Amino acid sequence: MKTALLLEKLEGQLATLRQRCAPVSQFATLSARFDRHLFQTRATTLQACLDEAGDNLAALRHAVEQQQLPQVAWLAEHLAAQLEAIAREASAWSLREWDSAPPKIARWQRKRIQHQDFERRLREMVAERRARLARVTDLVEQQTLHREVEAYEARLARCRHALEKIENRLARLTR
């Protein structure tokens, strides 16, 4: 009974932290947030740390059910340390301005958004031309639409290639 109450309390703390961290949980930082012994994840978002803490809570529940006392003790201590670290990080988030993305990264993120918009518009144009091609019966117009579809597909391929390069560049910059 006592164990069940403690598990519920840990679950409540995790839920509270998830709500408290929700506004900033997806923001990545340039440097690691925590020591490697505390969190195994390489991601620099609070969401990844919250997910890992949730996984550890599930592992703790399983260990309690299996009555694996040494594992229960270690997992409980580790989970408590993780929750405490996340709470400290959530409290200190406003002080992390020095770790925000530099202008160079922001510029690449804008380029990514712009290229994603280009990709979406090109897909729409290809779909629209294909729909018109399916309805047209005139041979000359079919050939014209077919050339347009090929041209838009080539543009789409170049756009996707550029988007992939931008994603790779952002990945390198945020390592």
From Swiss-Prot:
Domain of life: Bacteria
The keyword Iron-sulfur is annotated on this UniProt entry: no
Chain's role: Involved in the restart of stalled replication forks, which reloads the replicative helicase (DnaB) on sites other than the origin of replication. Recognizes abandoned replication forks and remodels DNA single-stranded binding protein (SSB) on ssDNA to uncover a loading site for DnaB. There are several restart pathways, the PriA-PriC pathway is a minor restart pathway. Also part of the minor PriC-Rep pathway for restart of stalled replication forks, which has a different substrate specificity than PriA. priB and priC have redundant roles in the cell.
InterPro entries reported for this sequence: PriB/PriC_sf, Primosomal_replicat_PriB/PriC
Protein's name according to its UniProt entry: Replication restart protein PriC
Effect seen on changing residue 121 to A: No longer interacts with SSB, does not load DnaB onto SSB-coated DNA substrate in vitro, does not complement in a priB-priC deletion
Recorded family membership: Belongs to the PriC family.
Encoding gene, per UniProt annotation: priC
Native source organism of the sequence: Escherichia coli (strain K12)
